[in-house]
Amino acid sequence: NPPNPKHEEAAVRLYAHMLGHLAERISVGAFAKNENISAYALIRAYKRMFALTPVQYQMALRVDAACELLANGANASDAAAELGFSDQAHLTREFKKRIGCTPGSYAAMRKAGEGRE
């Protein structure tokens, strides 16, 4: 099926919304309803454009933001709370999946790296 411009525009709006609301849990269904398209169509367009589903992409954005916070001295529990993770364990699970180490290890590596600059 060829891309549907209406669906792609909705996917871009969802992406922009996620960037501005990292800590909020997104409801793809509610967003799609607002856009007058089905959730399935929105997810399909989003995945075609960004290679991940909206939920996967939002998690990647949150973990990337956690990296920034940790690099700037935040602790994992503060980062988890600020970015909408249910708790520090949730951040740690997602962080390990995406980055390959715990938030604490990442922060320690970043801190050790600063001493060499």
Spell out what each predicted region is:
Residues 17-20, 48, 72, 97, ...:
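Residues within well-ordered alpha-helical secondary structure of globular protein domains
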Residues 1-26, 31-35, 57-75:
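A short, Lys/Arg-enriched amphipathic alpha-helix from helix-turn-helix/homeodomain DNA-binding modules
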Residues 114-117:
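C-terminal regulatory/oligomerization modules of transcriptional regulators
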